[in-house]
């Protein structure tokens, strides 16, 4: 049933091979699995770990502009996106997210959570056309994860 969800004990979390929530040293947390959507909500620590992992991976690439916002009141890490970049152009840079439930590692490819957006921030219906030589793209690629 696509409207069902389950609460499970989240024991660990990794982005690629980087341990963000260590099951050996940290207490488990409640995790919810929703089989009806692609929305993933993770603890703030895990969200920040993924975003910092992405930032570390692309920081030396001058063709990629990865931007994260901060929440005005709490200064917590907010939405992150690739500016002036199509999702198809960055999916090869993404590592998978790995969740540990019941001592089993489950892997999700993060490109399932990348959404192309237009310059006004609206999700586009289909992937943008390839960018030709000398052309620029004024949209972006949003990471659809939430803390």
Positions of predicted regions on the chain:
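C-terminal catalytic lobe of pepsin-like aspartyl proteases
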Residues: 1-147
